[in-house]
Amino acid sequence: CLRLVRDLEVDHGEVKYVILPTVTGVEHKYFAGPFAQRFKRSQVFVAPNQWSFPIDLPMSWLGFPAKRTHTLPADPRQTPFYDEFDYATVGPIELSVKPYTEVAFFHRETRSLLAVDTVLSIPVDPPEVVAQDPYPLMFHARNSAQDPLEDNPANRRKGWARIALFTFYFQPETLNVHPLKSILQNAVSSPNRSKKNYFGLYPFQWQQGWRKSFAMLRQDGQLLVAPILQTLIFNRGPEAVLAWVDRITQWDFQQIVPCHFSAPIAATPADFRRAFDFLQQPDPQSWSGFKHNLPKGDLSTLGQIDRQLRGSVPASPEDKSENG
């Protein structure tokens, strides 16, 4: 990553600003401070309402340079880069632990919306960066511990689809976990008991229907608000989120650059707004409070997490099908 940025500096000059536009994205916050340390003359701007878990530490303790780190002001015109970028902030949305805040940026020259985790598009094929090391794809493409690890296009797609289901649902309805005794017995008979292959341990038991589940999640590559955001975060502040969407759709962007999955995505403000339609479909029968264009069974684990966050008793497995 640093090498690629250094290559860009040759053509465009040194890095002037490092921006952390989220408060909850650990995969972003963890690297932002050390990244900023590598660019000694850059100014660092972070989203408001920053916090760390389990102990709320000062930003400087997380690697952010104390004298160069600033909070993004409410008015984008107060920033030194306003002539190039506008931005809009959502939050704080109160969660059970700490508040959620995210900032979306608009780059005027390229008419690009820079969206951290807000929306994304799921490809059929694994992204190039994932395919650089296909081992995890082969690992998850198997149906049992006895299956060989085979690298071919079909298995890469199969493994990618299952990893995507893991990522967004944690445990989709079509995934069961073997009992511990079966996991150990199957590991003994595995043809590959190497450390890299987790000593033959393979707890997953995929049921028929996982391909349909992936297709319904992917929605032909349309813009998608991740299920976790739909059901655990944005549903807790729908009015604030929709006001944020209104602000963003005033920008005349023609592509979206998210931090995950496919990028850039050809998309218009209307496409972006459509991804948030679920917030305009309240459903008192749904544990999230809204209708979602996703299988209810796949959302059941997120429903259990929601109950835990709210301090109530998790649903039993028998109740899963009723929690959509």
Language-model-derived ranges and their functions:
Residues 1-7, 103-107, 112-117:
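Conserved beta-strand hairpin/beta-sheet module of binuclear metal-dependent hydrolase folds
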Residues 19, 44-47, 113-118, 255-259:
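A structural signal for short, well-ordered beta-strand segments and their strand-loop junctions
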Residues 56-58, 98-103, 114-119, 123-129:
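A short secondary-structure junction signal
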Residues 7-17, 23, 30-38, 123, ...:
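Cap/insert and terminal regions of metallo-dependent hydrolase folds
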Residues 16-23, 42-52:
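Short internal beta-strands
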Residues 1-3, 26-31, 51-55:
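Short, charged/polar "capping" segments at the starts of alpha-helices
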Residues 15, 100-102, 110-111, 253:
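Short, surface-exposed beta-edge/turn micro-motifs
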Residues 47-103:
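Metallo-beta-lactamase
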